[in-house]
From Swiss-Prot:
It is found in: Cytoplasm. One of its GO terms (cellular component) is actomyosin. It comes from Rattus norvegicus (Rat). Transmembrane segments: none annotated. This is Leucine rich adaptor protein 1. GO terms for biological process: actomyosin structure organization; cell migration; positive regulation of canonical NF-kappaB signal transduction; positive regulation of cytokine production. The gene is Lurap1. Residues 107-140 are annotated as: Disordered.
């Protein structure tokens, strides 16, 4: 019993450190065997007579039961120590998890600050940065465009620098609407007059008159002249 009490003493000290309360002195004495379990009634109970041997046996039995109760108390304390260790382990895990979460959040915020956008934008940017192996047409167009860009300046150098091109004149802005209408009518009449020019047969020296236009050609020419004149009238009316 004394060896058991001595082996249980370190656990009790650990319990005192975990719980923060001192172990009762009566429990310590019962574990260390400081109380003598004598056989004489005088030692166990000084006021008792020597003839009360049966009463001494009862007192010794009570003290044995008290020692057993103390041992049970020790077991309860050991269970409390085990429970306390489990609680400490769970608290340590929660603290570590909180530390990891804060560290991950700081890393994520720094990543967002570097990308300068929202999480969806950063994910989209990382997805767009991946090479697209399926879009071969787009890669071909890019390669063809770069090839043309490299070939075009070389051909221009070989051909030489072209002279200054004549600026195109917007006659619609220079000529007023009335003069433009007259110009268009003159152009129409010039076209009609060119049809009446003389022409020569390829084997003969005879001068012949122009072939008479058919009814369809004359109707078409008249329609074109009427269309030009109608358009000129619309322009004048608009002005």
């Amino acid at each position: 019993m004394e060896g058991t009490a001595e082996s249980q003493t370190p656990d009790l000290r650990d319990v005192e450190g975990k719980v923060g309360r001192k172990t009762p002195e009566g429990l310590l004495r019962g574990l260390r065997g400081e109380c003598d379990l004598g056989t004489s009634g005088d030692v166990l109970l000084p006021g008792a007579s020597s003839t009360g041997h049966g009463l001494g046996d009862k007192i010794m039995a009570l003290r044995m039961e008290l020692a057993y109760l103390r041992a049970i108390d020790v077991k309860i304390l050991q269970q409390l120590v085990t429970l306390n260790e489990g609680i400490e382990a769970v608290r340590w895990l929660l603290e570590e998890r909180g530390t990891l979460t804060s560290h991950c959040s700081s890393l994520t915020s720094s990543q967002y600050s570097l990308t300068g956008g929202s999480p969806e934008r950063s994910r989209r940017g990382s997805w767009d940065s991946l090479p697209d192996t399926s879009s071969t047409d787009r890669l071909d167009s890019v390669s063809i465009g770069s090839f043309l860009d490299t070939v075009a300046p070389r051909e221009l150098d070989e051909q030489g620098h072209p002279g200054p091109s004549c600026p195109e004149i917007d006659w619609a802005k220079v000529i007023p609407s009335e003069d433009r209408a007259r110009t268009e009518v003159d152009m129409t009449s010039t076209k009609l007059g060119s049809l009446t020019a003389t022409w020569k047969l390829p084997g003969d020296g005879l001068q012949c008159g122009p072939p008479e236009p058919s009814e369809d050609d004359s109707a078409k020419q008249g329609f074109e002249a009427h269309w030009y004149w109608g358009q000129c009238q619309d322009d004048v009316t608009f002005l």
